[in-house]
Amino acid sequence: MEIQPLPPLPEPSAKTVTQLRRYASLLAVANERVRLTGPYDEETLWTDHIEDCLHVLPLLPPSGTVVDVGTGGGLPGAVLAVCRPDLKFTLLDSLSRKTKALAEIIAALKLPNAEVICMRSEDFAAARR
């Protein structure tokens, strides 16, 4: 099986970049209280995580709901929710300290298409059957 190169990154709008930068800032601040991801500074979050999340965009469905299992600080789910307001995102994590911090970030970003749920993935799947 031949490994295919990643699709080219879509060019986000200025509004999307502004919102993603705000997300990076909020995540960096939350990281000081609750360890949500490894790097703490905004620039490292941007280059090591947010830009990587953007590579998923071409692979998303045209409609429906996307579930981010083990979302932690919202990577990639929150990033994708900013970029694709036409899709619904469920950000799932089993650790309440992480989901509480992430819910605050999502509320600050005013992302109506993102829902944060504190639940184990097995329980979430069983509840949706």
Model-predicted regions and their roles:
Residues 54-129:
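Conserved SAM/SAH cofactor-binding pocket of Class I
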Residues 1-67, 100, 104-114:
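Class I SAM-dependent transferase core
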